[in-house]
């Protein structure tokens, strides 16, 4: 049975200001995530269908405040809440946030690929 504490999973930076400790357990990614206040992930998921993350996420927000934007509505998650985020969303961090999240790995890899592409493009235009 896989198990791990926060410090046993390698820290990886997905994009500037967005770091995560994540590992795959049988097709599900387990991630301890941190994001800074003011970060709007909308630009990071451009290029995905509808320019939104298509991965579902289940998790627990330890601290912070997150706004989840869908095409037809917006939802808010606050520290101390468990959550489910359906596919087709973009996330904005209103406060420094820390979460434990579970996501199907294949869907998450598509999202990470878009984030890395968009981050690289943004960094090359800054030069």
What is each PLM-predicted segment?
Residues 1-42, 48-50, 116, 123-127:
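A short, N-terminal "cap"/entry segment at the start of jelly-roll beta-barrel domains
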Residues 22, 65-67, 90:
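Residue-level detector of beta-strand face positions
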Residues 26, 69-73, 94-96:
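Short strand-coil-strand connectors
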Residues 42-44, 78-80, 110-114:
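A short, polar/proline- and glycine-enriched secondary-structure boundary/capping micro-motif
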Residues 51-68:
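Short, conserved beta-strand element in jelly-roll/cupin
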Residues 70-89:
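Short acidic-glycine-tyrosine-enriched beta hairpin
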Residues 87-112:
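Ligand-binding loop in jelly-roll beta-barrel domains
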Residues 105-125:
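Short peripheral tails and domain-boundary helices/loops at the edges of structured domains
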């Amino acid at each position: 049975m896989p198990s791990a504490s926060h410090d046993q999973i390698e820290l990886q930076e997905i994009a500037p200001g967005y770091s995560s400790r994540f590992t795959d357990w049988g097709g599900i990614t387990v991630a301890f995530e941190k994001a800074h206040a003011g970060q709007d992930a909308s630009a990071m998921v451009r290029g995905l269908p509808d320019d939104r993350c298509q991965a579902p996420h289940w998790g627990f927000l330890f601290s912070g405040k997150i706004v989840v934007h869908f095409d037809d509505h917006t939802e808010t998650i606050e520290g101390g809440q468990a959550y489910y985020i359906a596919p087709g969303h973009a996330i904005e961090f209103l406060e420094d946030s820390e979460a434990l999240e579970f996501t199907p790995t294949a869907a998450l890899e598509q999202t990470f690929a878009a984030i890395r592409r968009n981050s690289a493009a943004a960094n090359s235009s800054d030069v």
